[in-house]
Amino acid sequence: MGTVKRLLAAAGFVACGQMGLMAQASARITLGLSDWPGWVAWYVAQHNGYLKKYGAHVRLVWFPSYMTSVEALSAGRIDANCQALIDTIAPIVRKVPIKVILVTDNSAGNDALMVNNTIHSFAGLKGKSIAVEMNSIEEYLDVTALHEHHMGVSDVHFVNMSTGNSAAALITGRVAAAGVWNPWIQRIEARRAGHPLFTSAQAPGLIPDLVVARAAVVAAHKKDFVGLAKAWFATVRFIKAHPRQAARIMAPHVDLTPAVYAESLSGTRLFGAHMNRVAMNPGGSPASLYNSTIQTTRFLRQVKMVNATPSPRAFIDAGIVNQAAR
């Protein structure tokens, strides 16, 4: 799931701002989400009544543009948001008062470096152009892939484009490769325009996706957030037990068929209670945010997005997950 900077920003901001105001009128907490499979899963929680069952007074607020949701949380226009770790660290370094309270998933194949059908190795990628949104998760994955194959950024030519435009550039042959996430991976494959050379399945723990909330709201509505976590754990159990039924609930929200959307789910490792405790607490697992924060911040410092490494203890609130998992 890469950063979608300002796709439909003006329209998306106005629409989502209006939805946010309506949500605040009828719920204690507004939770922003966008089209990543691990976040569309919240509609399963809503559909199945888990939010109500576990006492989470939460209204889901849909954002057509992912980065608009990140900006809305930082500005305090929503109470909580579904966003990636890589897009959470910079606001934390800027002292935005937010806390990570839940891990929804890790990308496990839903982010990929896609290449045209003439390229079958990293050696074949040398000297070629890669369309990718710079300073995003997709660039992070691409740079990681290059390094793992003994190549560097100087061995390729990065072309800065939004993720949708990156996919279009590969499909039309304007570039040899593109850093994208689903559903763009599926759209490239459906047009037989390319295949994955490297995916997030080959980099466990590299791309954690989170629920991040305003610190003051967490303090004021802890019971609601505990209920939210319980609802999430129930959602994960349901999706794992009934993937086809879950896909039927989720697919209409992203304008895909259930069959196609089921493939997206397979590339997302949803985190239930056990994996949340692993991720939200210190430990040796690649899934621990204490480890991925260091790795992710190293990349962000290299591209000059941040100038400091935040302490995970300062922004990870494991109390919500630990209480919900009892």
Segments (PLM) and residue ranges:
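Secondary-structure end/capping motifs
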Residues: 220-305
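Conserved C-terminal helix/tail region of periplasmic/extracytoplasmic solute-binding proteins
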Residues: 294-326
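Bacterial N-terminal signal peptides
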Residues: 9-18
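Pocket-lining segment of extracytoplasmic ligand-binding domains
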Residues: 86-87, 158-159, 165-259
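Bacterial N-terminal signal peptides that target proteins for export
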Residues: 1-9
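Phosphate-coordinating loops and pocket residues in cytosolic domains that bind phosphorylated ligands
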Residues: 127, 190, 317
